Amino acid sequence: MKPSNFNGIKKYFGRKKPSIQEIVREPTAGGIVFRRNKQGELEFLLYQDARERWTIPKGHIESGETAQAAAIREVGEESGLKDVESICWLGKVNFRYRRVDKLVLISQQNYLIRPRTSGDEIKKEEWMTDIRWFSMQDALDKVEYEDIGKLILLAMKRIRQEGF
């Protein structure tokens, strides 16, 4: 005897996704933002998105804008930090997702960024669940995207090399 919802389950899983009609390329930029707290300990800035995943400030590169300028702008817009500087390029992360009948290809350029002053307070955007500073280990424990974890480790290496 079939369960009463068998036909509904069969109908749901039997659906076919629409075929991909278009490939969309979206260049983006992000920042691994770091600082030294009052005790001199290194911290990294992460925010929690609507899906409750911790990640870094990032967003689309606008027309005529460099990836580095976009990373600095996005960090400011998403964190409230007004005076930041880009230290160096850390690398590119590529990922993709499907949006109905479109395949979206993201190419994200990432930069090591730090606040120039210690007085700026971070602010949470309404679409964020949370935003805060984490120790390196806590940041690595929080991020769910493996590539972002690798970027944090690379950032740590560069920070030590440069003596920040």
Segments and roles (model prediction):
Residues 37-43, 100-103:
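Short, solvent-exposed loop/turn segments that connect beta-strands within catalytic domains
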